């Protein structure tokens, strides 16, 4: 297995222009494909998850042109649901932002589809979405294990009316249903069962749907109404915001060992909830400055904090490794959905933090981290999870090297992450 050893970094200083947001990129690509008209997406993320979506759209008959650097994409919208004459198999890797929304979108089209992916994708639940779609008239069956991909879908359309969906495991199930609802036969009402996790990701979905001409009535996140007679319309130009989750590593690095770091491509008006990571970092003691299209983080005396991170689960992972540089104990609570991400992130995080000497308590939906004066040099396993690799790179800000196994797993969202980190290192 390939590995990368990062030597201790004395200081972090500089500016980073963020790659496009994965969450925004794949939502915008799908709606561009379904919309009437042509959409030009700029600052599109170039990564594995986006390539899986683009490859799927090609198989579904969508025409697009991609710039040489793959960050600009002009999509010719179909102006209708997907339709194929021959059965199509779509391999979606481990891209939840492609698997869930496409599963819903294909139900309203015509044709026969199989959705599959990497072995880990077959362990990531999709049952709550499938159940809701079936209640709305969709023809879906599990090809291997109940509640998990791969799926066989026969496009039959979605009925109008009221449907319930469990929001307690992943907000992607609701996002997927919301994005397909305007293509249903009439008005759709979606009632939420359980406590809806990751609400800011739903805000991203609603914001992008509005940019493509569809209004959704949000009744305090308990019910969503998609009025009949709406159609996706290309907005012309669509700028993909920088990835707020990716910003977290650089903001944290500056808080630990700045200098200062300025990240551009996001700012105080960002539609991404993960930008609230900067608020958590500020509570720990970092100095944060906000602009319209940038955030600056400066070094501070960090202290441990006890917080609920249900609203920003991806960025919360960065808090777990930042905690190693804080005074006192840090508690990250209400993050059960870490367990159904690219890997079981609660278990993985606890295991790897212990390798470097930290005291860790792992609960069903929380992790508590107590730092130690000196970290041990360890080889960090990344579990084919891009965020594990990027989070643990921060350990190089100590006086001990850190080895990252399989560093190229960052290609899921941030292929040149380690180059960007190196450029900031003094």
Swiss-Prot record:
The gene is aroA. The keyword Acyltransferase does not apply. Its main location: cytoplasm. Catalyzes the transfer of the enolpyruvyl moiety of phosphoenolpyruvate (PEP) to the 5-hydroxyl of shikimate-3-phosphate (S3P) to produce enolpyruvyl shikimate-3-phosphate and inorganic phosphate. PROSITE patterns: EPSP_SYNTHASE_1, EPSP_SYNTHASE_2. 3-phosphoshikimate binds at residues 22-23, 27, 170-172, 198, 314, 337, 341. This is 3-phosphoshikimate 1-carboxyvinyltransferase. InterPro entries: Enolpyruvate_Tfrase_dom, Enolpyruvate_Tfrase_sf, EPSP_synthase, EPSP_synthase_CS, RNA3'P_cycl/enolpyr_Trfase_a/b. GO terms for cellular component: cytoplasm. Its EC number is 2.5.1.19. The active site is at 314 (proton acceptor). Keywords: Amino-acid biosynthesis, Aromatic amino acid biosynthesis, Cytoplasm, Transferase. It is found in: Cytoplasm. One of its GO terms (molecular function) is 3-phosphoshikimate 1-carboxyvinyltransferase activity. It catalyses: 3-phosphoshikimate + phosphoenolpyruvate = 5-O-(1-carboxyvinyl)-3-phosphoshikimate + phosphate.
């Amino acid at each position: 297995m390939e590995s990368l050893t990062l030597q201790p970094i004395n200081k972090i200083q500089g500016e980073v222009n963020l790659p496009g947001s994965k969450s925004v990129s794949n939502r915008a690509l799908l709606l561009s494909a379904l919309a009437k008209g042509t959409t030009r997406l700029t600052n599109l993320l170039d990564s594995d998850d986006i390539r899986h979506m683009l490859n799927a759209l090609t198989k579904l008959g969508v025409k697009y042109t991609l710039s040489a650097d793959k960050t600009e994409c002009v999509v010719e919208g179909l102006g209708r649901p997907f339709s194929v004459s021959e059965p199509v198999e779509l391999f979606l890797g481990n891209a939840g932002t492609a698997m869930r929304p496409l599963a819903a979108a294909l139900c309203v089209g015509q044709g026969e589809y199989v959705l599959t992916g990497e072995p880990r994708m077959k362990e990531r639940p999709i049952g709550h979405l499938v159940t809701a779609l079936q209640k709305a008239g969709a023809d879906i069956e599990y090809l291997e294990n109940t509640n998990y991909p791969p799926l066989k879908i026969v496009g039959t359309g979605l009925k109008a009316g009221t449907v319930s969906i469990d929001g307690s495991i992943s907000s992607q199930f609701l996002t997927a249903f919301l994005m397909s609802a305007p293509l249903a036969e009439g008005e759709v009402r979606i009632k939420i069962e359980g406590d809806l996790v990751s609400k800011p990701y739903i805000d991203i979905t609603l914001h992008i749907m509005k940019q493509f001409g569809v209004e959704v009535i949000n009744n305090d996140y308990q019910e969503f109404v998609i009025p009949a007679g709406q159609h996706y319309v290309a907005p012309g130009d669509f700028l993909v915001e920088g990835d707020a989750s990716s910003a977290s590593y650089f903001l944290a690095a500056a808080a630990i060992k700045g200098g200062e770091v300025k990240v551009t491509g996001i700012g105080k008006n960002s539609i991404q909830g993960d930008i609230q990571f900067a608020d958590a970092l500020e509570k720990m003691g970092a100095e944060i400055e906000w602009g319209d299209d940038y955030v600056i983080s400066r070094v501070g005396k960090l202290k441990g904090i006890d917080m609920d991170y249900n609203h920003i689960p991806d960025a919360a992972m960065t808090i777990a490794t930042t905690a190693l540089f804080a005074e006192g104990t840090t508690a990250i609570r209400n993050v059960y959905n870490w367990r159904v991400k690219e890997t079981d992130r609660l278990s993985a995080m606890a295991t790897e933090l212990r390798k470097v000497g930290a005291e860790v308590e792992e609960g069903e939906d929380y992790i508590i981290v107590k730092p130690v004066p000196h970290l041990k040099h360890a080889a960090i396993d990344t579990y084919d999870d891009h965020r594990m690799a990027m989070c643990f790179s921060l350990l190089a800000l100590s006086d001990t090297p850190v080895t990252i196994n399989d560093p190229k797993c960052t290609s899921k969202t941030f292929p040149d992450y380690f180059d960007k980190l190196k450029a900031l290192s003094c």
